[in-house]
Amino acid sequence: KWGGLILLGSAPTNVATTAFIEGITAKTYGGTDPADSSGSLQYVRVWHGGAVVGANNEINGITFGGVGSGTVVDHCEVAFNLDDGFEFFGGTVNVKYLSALFMGDDGFDTDQGYIGKGQFLFVIEGLTGDHSMEIDSGVGTNQDATPRSHPAFYSFTLIGGGTGSGARTGELIHVNDGTGGKFGNGILAFPNGNGLLFEDCGSMEYTQTLPAASVSISNPGYFYFSANNIIDTATTASQFALHTGTTSACTPADTWTAVSGAPGFAAVATTDLAEGSATFNPLPSATGAACTGTKDAPPNGDAFFSTVSCKGAFGSTTDNWLAGYSWLACSGKMAGRTCTGIAASPFATLLSNVTLLSNTYASNTVLGASISYILASQVFVSASLTIPAGTTIFALPVPTGIAAPALVVVKGGALVATGSATMPITFTSVLAESALVSSATASTDSNENAITLGERGKWGGLILLGNAPTNMPTTT
């Protein structure tokens, strides 16, 4: 329904020093400062985004382009995004407590030399998601481009769409383009395919033996996947796979294993996979494998990672960090929720089909019927603009000092607005009636002393400019 958040920083990537980000025009990211800060995102929800801006070009829920480790990111959620939930194009930003719900593509996507850390990551794909995680690195056909991506993701729960009718086929983690990384304390459940699939590995070493810290820091040229991770697939043979027709060898250095069988969720049924339910509870049970099995210590003693008592995105049987703000909790689709609901939109009078008026109308245009229109700026009409009967145009309020939204028909233009007694055409503020009254003051031509605005002055108005005579100069 809209785009998303895009943060562009100056941390390193493995593409050009600066590159153009997808989804918008001519904005660059990347640089030489791994500690760069793009600010902070804490308890931020991005819902119903990912609008298409061109062929095969959608906007991710939250895009990190060359974002550095000085940026603070925790307790953020993307829900119902058309493309990926969280995508990292290079950079070094570290993240905690992130949830990606019901994406049209991947929950998490790392690429272009991303070297960052993440803990407590939750994905539920629904029936439309492609992968819970797409882990990439290379540039073009060069799978060994440097710096090589090396995400360190620990304590994650990835829930696929299952094998029922309508579920999309795909592995939960797709490891591609020579990426490195460290993955531990994870739960992979309900895939419609493999748990983890390798493709186009380059010279990467794939191992289940975690190298020493000195190797980690100086040469992150390996992909480590802990044998303590749980992959709940139909058979152990389908836990791991190599993509057929891969262009570069994928030869693990070890015999790969993972814990098989159910992780021991408190309550997750196949009927919950499409959109959750009132009883859906992805926390681990005390007697399940997630809590009773061997847990991974923080990799190389890294203080960024918290010690946990259970595997998965929830570090204990009681730590439901989604309960107060997640779409699942606020929509009544999760047990243990404390969120009381999703606040009603202040634009509740708008129709389901809402369109922003253009800044200019230089050719004859007929607005669509059964559409709500938003007037957010001064709109100039130099051709014919026809507004159907019954249409309502809602004007946004603007801060003091900003030009008020107005519809301006310039000389040579025409406004054709033919309503009726039963279907009038209305221009009004987008604000609800209860929000219109204001104690602010302003001056008018007839009253230079301040008057109380009350319900007045919420937007500009209509201005029609023609060619008929006046007693002023020919034009004024």
Regions found by a protein language model. Give the residues of each.
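Extracellular beta-rich repeat passengers
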Residues: K1-A369, I374-P388, L396-A414, S420-T476
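Extended, charged catalytic domains and RNA/DNA-binding interfaces, predominantly
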Residues: I393
